[in-house]
Amino acid sequence: MSKILITGAHGQLGTELCHLLDEKEIAYDAFGSKELDITNQGQVKAKFAGLKPAVIFHCAAYTAFDKAEDEAKELNWQVNEDGTKNVAEAAQSIGATMVYISTDYVFDGTNEDEYQVDAPTNPKNEYGKAKLAGEEAVKSIVDQYYIIRTSWVFGEYGKNFVYTMLRLAKTHDHLTVVDYQVGRPTW
């Protein structure tokens, strides 16, 4: 039986984590949204109770932050708040440590310096608000947890800004990108 469980295993971060654990020959159980619907509380509790992992990497998320404002607003909240709450409750019920992957969108972006771990949050969009609600659920439910706030995630697998720019540079003489965003790429 594996001591590690990964949600969101088919997303960019989950895929990277699975490959890293494979390279290190560390056993794990990994589930994408088709194998584990985190918005289904009963399914999550049953899966965790059956497997009893010691550590849960909660990588599952709704990440289309532009669509989270309107057409997918409800789905954003179902996955990022309700789903995270379900994972947190199931983790706590088996005494597992939870690692929650959050985002820099929990901040308003007005800080000119780096954000410190205890910096005040002030999300400006629905995605950031839902991810912050997920953080609050983890903090209030799970005894042993880590919250990791990432930005500009990229890696070998999945769609990401770095690979998009490399691909476009091969086919375009001139690229235009926004110049008002500041972030720290996360590999």
What are the residue ranges of the model-derived segments?
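NAD(P)-cofactor binding segment of oxidoreductase domains
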Residues: D70-V99
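Catalytic helix-loop patch of NAD(P)-dependent Rossmann-fold dehydrogenases
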Residues: Q78, D82-N86, V106-I148, W152-V153
